[in-house]
C-alpha cells in the first residue's frame, strides 16, 4: 500500500515538473506566435464580415474602435445573423433603440449555446469578448454544423426528453397523436377521459406533450371561439401538471449533476496535488507523470466544457421553465376567463328559457280564450246566414219578375241598335271621304311649307340687296368669350338669334326692364372662329377689286377683342389671323386669278391717331412725324397723302409690314387690359387695276380701322399719361358718335372736323362707300353699362344710309379729257403771265382788278405741296406714274392748285369783301344749274397762322366744297368748271369806265367767258356732264372749285393760303 502511494507521489512530481516546464516555455517563445495568431484571426474575422455583408466595406486592418463604431447600433449584428440563418431575427423599425437590437442578438446567441458578451462591452468596454463571440459564430457556421433550420429549431420548445425505458411503452400514444397531426384532433369527452385514466400522458415524450398542448389551444381558439368544455380544461390542467413535474425533475437532476461534478473536481484536485508531490521522480517517471498530467488536463478541460455546457443547459432550462410558467399562468387566466364566460352564458340561457316559458304560457291562455270566442262567433254567423238566405230567396223572386219585364224592352233595343249601326257605317263612310279631301288640302299646305325656307332665304337676299342699294352701314356683333379663370362670372348675354337678334340683361337686377333687345345684320357668339367671321366679310373684300371703296372698323370698350378680330393674337398661325391678314391674303389670291384680264397694283398705308395726332407707323422715322388729313379724299382714296405708301405683292410682304406697324403702335397696360391699344389704327389698302383689253382703270380702297376702346377711368384706373390718352380716346369716340347721330338724322351739317378720327373716316361715312362695323361686346356682368352703351351706338350706326356705292372706274376717254384739261391749264398759265405784264402797264385800273382778284381768290385754296401751274405738264405727269402718282396727277388736273396770289390780294377791305359776296350770287345759281349746291360757307377760305409750316398739309374742311367717291361726276364737274368758268361779272367790271381795258391781250384772256352761265350747257364738248340727283337723296359730294382761266388771268403771283382743322386765321403776311 505504501509503495503504491510512493509511486503515485513520484508520478505527481513528474506531472508537476512537466507542467511547470510547459508553462515556462509558453511564457517565452510562444507569446509571439500567439500574437501573430490573434492578429491573423482578427483579419480573418474582418474579411468574413465583409464577405457576409458586402455593404460594410471595412478596411482589412480595421481597429477595435472602427469595429465598435460599426457594431454599436446592433443593426449589423442582427443583419449578420439574418444573413447566416434567414428568418431567425425579427428586424425592428429604424427608430428601435440599439440596446434592444443587441439584446435580441445576445438572446439568439444563448439559444445557439454560443459565448456571449455584455452590452457594456460593445459600448465602452473591452472588445475581446465581442470578437470571441463573433469568432465562435463564424466557426459554428463555417464548419457546417448549423444548417438553415438549426436556429429555428433552437427557438422551439427545447426541453430535454426522458430517455427511460418507457419509450417502447408510450409508442402507441405517440403514434396515435402523430397520426392526427395532419387532421383534426378528436375532442370528444370519451377520448379525453381515456387519456386521463391511462398513463400515456406520463409516459409520453415532453415534445409530444408540448405539441399536443399547442394543437389543443389552437383548436379551442379557432373552432370553439374561446369556449372550453370541462373535459378539455381537465386535459389541459393534466398536461400542465405533467410538464411542471418533468421540469422540476430535470432541475433536481441538474442539481445532482452539479454536486457530482464538484465531488469529481475535488477528487481530481487531490490527485493533482499527489501527482505534484511525486514530480521529483526519475526522468522516466516524469515522462509517465507528464503523460498522466496531459491526460488529466484533457479530462479536466473536457469536464470543464461539460460543466459549462451543463450550466448553460441549466440556464436555458430555467429560462424555459420561466417561459412555461408564464404560459401556464396565461393559460390559467384564459381558462378562468373561459369558465366565467361559460357560466355567464349559462345564466343568460336559463333566463331566456324562463322568459320564453312564461311567454308561451301566456300565449296558450290567450289561444284558449280566442277559441271560446270563435265558437261563439260561429254560432252567431250560422244564425245570420239563415236569415240572409231567406232574404235572398225573396230577392230572387223579385229579380226574376224584373228580368221578365225587361226582356221585351231588350228586344226593342236590339232592333234600335241595328238601325243605329247602319247609321254609323254611313257616317263613317262620309268621314273617310272628308278625310281624303282634307288630306289633299294638307299636302298642298305641306308643299308650301317646304318652300317656306326657300322663300325666307330669298327675302333675306332681297333685304340685303335693298340694304346694299340704300348703302346702310352693315353692323356685325361679336361677343368675346370669357378669359381663362372668368368662367364663374355672370354673363349679360341672354339670347342670340339666328337672324341677328341679341338680348342682353343685367345679371345683378331682376325684372323685365333689365332686358334689352338689339337687331344687327349678324351676331357671332363666343364660339365663333376667325374664319367664320371673315366668311361674312369676304364679299365686301372682293368688291374692292371691282373699284369700290370699303371701310371696316371695330368698335367697343377696352378689352372687348377689337384688336383680336382685326389683327388676331398672332400672325404665326394662319388659324389666328384676323380680318386684316385674311382680307389682304384674299385680295392677292383674287389678283392672281384675274391677272390675265386685269393687272392690279396694291399699296398699303398704316397710320395711327394718337392724342389727336396722325402718325405714320410704317415709316422709317417711326411715329414721331405728324401728318395732315384731307377732308376730301382723293380719287384714289388717299385721305393722308403724306403717309408712306408701300407696294406689296404677296401676303408675306403684308405680314412683314403689319408686324412693323403693330410694333410701332402705341399700347399700354391698364387695370382692364394688359395690352390696351392707346391709339386708333387705320390700315389703308389701295388697289389700282388696269383692264388689259380696254385700258380702263379701276381704283378701290380698303380702310381697316382698329379703334381704341372706350374706357371708364374709375375702372381702368388710368393716371398720368394713360389718363390723357383715355381722355383723347373718349373725345374722339364721342365725336364719332356725333357724326353717326347727324348721319342717322340726315342733318345738313355733319361735324367731321371735331376729331381727326372722323376726318379720316369722312370718305367712308359720308361718301358712297361700303362700310362694315364690328361691334365687340364684353359678356362680363360688371361691364353691363358699357355693353348697353356700345350696342346703342351700333344700333344707331346700322340706321345710317350712305347711298349706293359706285365703282371708281376711269375709261380711256376720261383720261384723254384729263390730258386736254392739263394742256388748257398750261395755256391759261401763259395767259396769266401776259395779264400780269399788262397790269404793270395799266396801273390806273388796279382798283377794279383787285376786286376781281379778291373775288376769284376766295374760290380756290391750294396746297403748298402741289405743283404750280407754271410747271410743264410733262413734269407733272412724270411724278404721277403708277399707283401712287396717278392720284396726284388727277388732283393737279382737277383742282384749283395754281399760281401765286398777288400782294394786293391779302389786303382787301371790308367793302371789297361785301362786293365779293354780292358778286358771287350768280355763281351760286350757276352751280345749282349744274347740280351742285354751293353755300355761302363753300367759298370761305381759312388758313394757317404760319404758311411756311412744312409738317401740315392743306386741309379743306367739311364746310368747303369736297370731293366724293363719285369719280366720274366729280371729274366731269371739275373739267366743266375749269374750261367754262363764270366770267360774266368780271367782264362787267372790265367794261366799267374806271376799269376799261383796250388791250388785245385782255380780250383774248376773257374771250372764252363772253357767254352767260346758263348757255354753257349748249356748248358742244366731249366732256361728260355731271348727272343731276333727286332732291331726296343725301347731299351730293362736292368738288373744290378750281381757279378758272379768267381767275388765273387776274390773280397775282402770290400762292394762296392753306387751311387745316387746327387754324382758321387768314394769311396777311406779304411775300
From Swiss-Prot:
User: Could you tell me which InterPro entries the record lists for this protein?
Assistant: CH_dom, CH_dom_sf, Kinesin-like_fam, Kinesin_motor_CS, Kinesin_motor_dom, Kinesin_motor_dom_sf, P-loop_NTPase
State the residue spans of region: Disordered: 157-181, 852-931, 995-1071
Q: Name one GO molecular function term.
A: ATP binding
Q: Where is the Calponin-homology (CH) domain?
A: 39-142
Q: Which residues form the Kinesin motor domain?
A: 472-800
- Positions with biased composition (Polar residues): 1034-1049
Parts of the chain that traverse the membrane:
none
Identify the SUPFAM superfamilies for this entry.
Calponin-homology domain, CH-domain, P-loop containing nucleoside triphosphate hydrolases
Keywords noted in UniProt: ATP-binding, Coiled coil, Microtubule, Motor protein, Nucleotide-binding
Binding of ATP, residues: 556-563
One GO BP annotation of this record: microtubule-based movement
Give a yes or no for keyword Electron transport in this entry: no
Q: PANTHER family of this UniProt entry?
A: KINESIN-LIKE PROTEIN KIN-14J, KINESIN-LIKE PROTEIN KLP-3
Q: What does the similarity note say? A: Belongs to the TRAFAC class myosin-kinesin ATPase superfamily. Kinesin family. KIN-14 subfamily.
Could you identify this protein by its name? Kinesin-like protein KIN-14J
